[in-house]
UniProtKB/Swiss-Prot annotation:
InterPro entries: E3_ubiquit_lig_Bre1 (IPR013956), Znf_C3HC4_RING-type (IPR018957), Znf_RING (IPR001841), Znf_RING/FYVE/PHD (IPR013083), Znf_RING_CS (IPR017907)
Annotated Basic and acidic residues bias: 18-28, 603-620, 634-652
Chain intervals for the UniProt region annotation (Disordered): 1-32, 120-148, 520-562, 579-652
CDD domains: RING-HC_RNF40
Gene that encodes it: Rnf40
Species the sequence originates in: Rattus norvegicus
Name this protein carries in UniProt: E3 ubiquitin-protein ligase BRE1B
Length: 1002
């Protein structure tokens, strides 16, 4: 990284100004390196320190020189950038104005050609020609125009002498200054301008022909000689003015060229002044250099004098050697004096050159200031006295007067138009006010009818909403009713099946009873037990059939009777359970809104009926065939039991039917409550759900209690009947189940207590809900009353609507009458519109006249604008020529500067030649002395030592490092470069591949 940084530093440091490098290369052949006197040195360290001090001085001088060169180069770069920016801006402006010039010249020529065509085709309509010229002129593109090709000479009309002179002046002024890339454009511009001049000359000739026709016509007619003389005078004056205008244009062109030349001279003098300033700075720098050199020489001279006076007489022992040294010191002293005189002469000559340049600079500055003052203080009287200014002033006054007349006519026409419009608008406003009054009446009546209609619609909407609510309630109750009907139909079908089974079992029972009677008869004959069985009761047997089947003594009849009894008991139990399930389902539907006490009886009865059924089922199979001795007593008991069971079943059916009726009534009430609770808030619904859950929990608790009782009774019975291991195992299981159920009972009791506490709260809430239901029922009654009132009001509204329809029909008839009046007024309006059209036609004529006059005004304005554009175009041409001259001036200044530089270098070379001649003469004088050969030999050795490479001390110096300008042999430099030791052996300055070159010393 250090090597790279050294390379960059060396590269930056070596970039000096090219001019200085050239001067340095020129002077290397002539300048002599002065020896440096280090004085008395006692050691190598002291010598190194003195050498380093001298090197530091030299480096400081080089740094100052480099900074000065950098400042000069920066100033020069800034000047060049400013000049380039100004040149670009002027080029852009010239290009833009040149394009505008081409477009305007093409438009002028096209306009003139169109006027010529119109005048040649229709000379009998001169009044319309001016109006048409404005519409016929097309906008042509300068790049695609046919004007790029100039007309041939045979089709051009002959020009007058002033016009020819003007065209020739234009051609002579532009052809010499045009470059190759702009020749086509310049040719087009010259051709266009020449054609414009031709057109103006042709117009002048047409005017002269018209004047001659007028004169000839006037010669045939006697009266009007004064007018003819006046026209002749005017024609002569017009011709004279046209000649004067062309002459003035030529003069303006010539003056503009002279002005541009003067301006170019001013710019050239300014550049000269700048160059002189730079040369003065260079000369001052040379003077400073010479002064420094003079000071050095003075120091050397003083040292030589001191050595001459003191040191050389004491330095040696032999007189010959001392004498030789004295002669050498005297010779050096004379040489130094001669050099001092030469330098003084050179300084005097340079001073004379500087004074001369200073005088030239002051003269150029004075002329520049004088020209600037003259340019700034251009008087206005000169501008006002020009013919163009006076002509434009006269045209402006004429156009201004015409515009004032046109404005007055336009104001009069606008006043008439406004008066007619105001009268028409007043009539229309009167009719509109009448129409608005009638419309307001109609609107008020229609608004009243709409209000009544809106009231009727509101009543209708309220009735419709109530109907939809009732319909929705019926739709909600419909699915429940359908489910109940479906359940009832399924239960009826089941009852029919059970009835069929009962009939079949009765038939089988009769057959069994007949067999039993036969068996009894056989048994009475065999065992003499006739009195006990001689009084059978058919009704009793029919009623006590299940009991008999259970306690029948016959071995063959017992299984059938047991099966029939089990089926009958199952049928009755199924019927009762189905009815109970029907009641439970009906109560569950209404349970969400009904109080908790209504659903408990059916669930309470169900656990009461279940243990009886289970006991019957257990007792049925558990009763085995009794012994033959106790058959009659058991038969009586079974009959009594069967009668009691049938009586209980009939009572149970009656109770279930009554409960079914009550449940249906409660279901209807619950439907109403359900509709009411659907509109209740969510909190009350949650309370009702809690109450329903509480009822279910209570029912489960009761059911569990009944099951526990049944299980306890079953355990007692089984403990009496069964004493084997199976019974004990069942008892243990039952006890475990009892413990589990007791634990569950304790939990349910706790839940029951919590639910009871909640029931108190929910009961209070239920009472509040009942009060709210009462209020809602009251509101429903009030709504019904309001609905009845609305119905009555609706009837009244229908009657009012009929009356309003009749009034509307009457109003429609009135509207028809008003429409007829409006039609009549429309007829009058049409007549007024016809009058307005007639007025508008007259107004259109006035406007046409106004447009014609405005077109004439615009034509005059266009002529004025064209004249102004022509002046601007001429100015642009002038600026273009000036820019061309400005472009040429830097080239001239550069060539002049190059010549001056060459002359300056020539002078310097002559001075160097004279100095070398004087040195040669001095050397020739030195050869006269006796020991000159020895001196020359020593000098030759010294020079050879200087010419040998200090690195290898064998080869000659033939390569120079451009970074520090130390000289070595090419092989050493290349070897160090290839070995990547890219630093100078003397000053340790880094160098690159392009920083060492061969040197040929001759």
């Amino acid at each position: 990284m250090s090597g790279l940084s050294n390379k960059r530093a060396a590269g930056d440091g070596g970039s000096g100004p090219p001019e200085k490098k050239l001067n340095r290369e020129e002077k290397t052949t002539t300048t002599l390196i002065e020896p440096i006197r280090l004085g008395g040195i006692s050691s190598t360290e002291e010598m190194d320190s003195k050498v380093l001090q001298f090197k530091n001085k030299k480096l400081a001088e080089r740094l100052e020189q480099r900074q000065a060169c950098e400042d000069e180069l920066r100033e020069r770069i800034e000047k060049l950038e400013k000049r380039q920016a100004t040149d670009d801006a002027t080029l852009l402006i010239v290009n833009r104005y040149w394009a505008q010039l081409d477009e305007t010249v093409e438009a002028l020529l096209q306009c003139y050609e169109n006027q010529r065509e119109l005048s040649s085709s229709g000379t009998e309509v001169p009044g319309c020609q001016e109006g048409l010229t404005r519409d016929v002129i097309p906008r042509t593109d300068p790049g695609t125009s046919d004007l790029r090709e100039p007309l041939p000479m045979q089709f051009r009309a002959p020009l007058s002498e002033p016009a020819l002179a003007f065209v020739v002046a234009l051609g002579a002024s532009s052809c010499e200054e045009v470059e190759l890339q702009l020749q086509g454009r310049m040719e087009f511009s010259k051709a266009a301008v020449s054609r414009v001049v031709e057109a103006s000359d042709r117009l002048q000739r047409q005017v002269e022909e018209l004047c001659q026709r007028v004169y000839s016509r006037g010669d045939s007619e006697a009266p009007g000689e004064v007018a003819r003389a006046r026209t002749r005078e005017l024609g002569r004056e017009n011709r004279r003015l046209q000649d004067l205008a062309t002459q003035l244009q030529e003069k303006h062109h010539r003056i503009s060229l002279e002005y541009s030349e003067l301006q170019d001279k001013v710019t050239s003098t300014e550049t000269k002044v700048l160059e002189m300033e730079t040369t003065v700075e260079d000369l001052q720098w040379d003077i400073e250099k010479l002064r420094k050199r003079e000071q050095k020489l003075n120091k050397h001279l003083a040292e030589a004098l001191e050595q001459l006076n003191s040191g050389y007489y004491v330095s040696g022992s032999s007189t010959g050697f001392q004498g030789g040294q004295i002669t050498l010191s005297m010779q050096k002293f004379e040489m130094l004096n001669a050099e001092l005189e030469e330098n003084q002469e050179l300084a005097n000559s340079r001073m004379a050159e500087l004074e001369k340049l200073q005088a030239e600079l002051q003269g150029a500055v004075r002329t520049n200031e004088r020209l600037k003052v003259a340019l700034r203080s251009l008087p206005e009287e000169v501008v006002r006295e020009t013919g163009e200014y006076r002509m434009l002033q006269a045209q402006f006054s004429l156009l201004y007067n015409e515009s004032l007349q046109v404005k007055t006519q336009l104001d009069e026409a606008r006043g008439l138009l406004l008066a007619s419009k105001n009268s028409h608008l007043r009539h229309i406003e009167h009719m509109e006010s009448d129409e608005l009054g009638l419309q307001k009446k109609l609107r008020t009546e229609v608004i009243q009818l709409e209000d009544t209609l809106a009231q009727v619609r509101k009543e209708y909407e309220m009735l419709r909403i109530e109907f939809e609510q009732n319909l929705a309630a019926n739709e909600q109750a419909g699915p429940i009713n359908r489910e109940m009907r479906h359940l009832i139909s399924s239960l009826q079908n089941h009852n029919h099946q059970l009835k069929g089974d009962a009939q079949r079992y009765k038939r089988k029972l009769r057959e069994v009873q007949a067999e039993i009677g036969k068996l009894r008869a056989q048994a009475s004959g065999s065992s003499h037990c006739g009195p006990n069985l001689s009084h059978p009761d058919d009704s009793g047997l029919n009623a006590l059939a299940p009991g008999k089947e259970d306690s029948g003594p016959g071995p063959g009849g017992t299984p059938d009777s047991k099966k029939e009894l089990a089926l009958v008991a199952g049928a009755t139990s199924v019927a009762s359970s189905v009815k109970k399930e029907e009641l439970v389902s009906s109560e569950d539907d209404a349970q969400a809104l009904a109080p908790g006490t209504q659903g408990l009886p059916s669930r309470g009865r169900e656990p009461e009926a279940r243990p009886k059924r289970e006991l019957r089922e257990r007792e049925g199979p558990s009763l085995g065939p009794p012994p033959a001795a106790s058959t009659l007593s058991r038969a009586d008991r079974e009959k009594a039991k069967a009668e009691e069971a049938r009586r209980k079943e009939s009572e149970l059916l009656k109770g279930l039917r009554a409960e079914l009726k009550k449940a249906q009534e409660s279901q209807k009430e619950m439907k109403l409550l359900l509709d009411m609770y659907k509109s209740a808030p969510k909190e009350q619904r949650d309370k009702v759900q809690l109450m329903a859950a509480e009822r279910k929990a209570k029912a489960e608790v009761d059911e569990l209690r009944s099951r526990i009782r049944d299980l306890e009774e079953r355990d007692r019975r089984e403990s009496k009947k069964i004493a084997d291991e199976d019974a004990l195992r069942r008892i243990r299981q039952a006890e475990e189940q009892i413990e589990h159920l007791q634990r569950k009972l304790g939990a349910t009791k706790q839940e029951e207590e919590a639910l009871l506490s909640e029931m108190d709260v929910t009961g209070q809430a239920f009472e509040d809900m009942q009060e709210q239901n009462g209020r809602l029922l009251q509101q429903l009654r009030e709504k019904d009353d309001a609905n009845f009132k609305l119905m009555s009001e609706r009837i009244k509204a229908n009657q009012i609507h009929k009356l309003l329809r009749e009034e509307k029909d009457e109003l429609g008839e009135q509207v028809l009458g008003l429409k007829s009046q409006v039609d009549a007024q429309l007829l009058t309006v049409q007549k007024l519109e016809e009058k307005e059209r007639a007025l508008q036609g007259s107004l259109g004529g006035v406007e046409k006249e106004l447009t014609l006059r405005s077109q004439a005004l615009e034509l005059n304005k266009r002529k004025a604008v064209e004249a102004a554009q022509l002046a601007e175009d001429l100015k642009v041409q002038l600026e273009h020529v000036q820019t061309r001259l400005r472009e040429i001036q830097p080239c001239l200044a550069e060539s002049r500067a190059a010549r001056e530089k060459e002359s300056f270098n020539l002078k310097r070379a002559q001075e160097d030649i004279s100095r070398l001649r004087r040195k040669l003469e001095k050397q020739r004088k030195v050869e006269v002395y006796a020991d000159a050969d020895e001196i020359l030999q020593e000098e030759i050795k010294e020079y050879k030592a200087r010419l040998t490479c200090p690195c290898c001390n064998t080869r000659k110096k033939d390569a120079v490092l451009t970074k520090c300008f130390h000289v070595f042999c090419f092989e050493c430099v290349r070897g160090r470069y290839e070995a990547r030791q890219r630093k100078c052996p003397k000053c340790n300055a880094a160098f690159g591949a392009h920083d060492f070159h061969r040197v040929y010393i001759s």
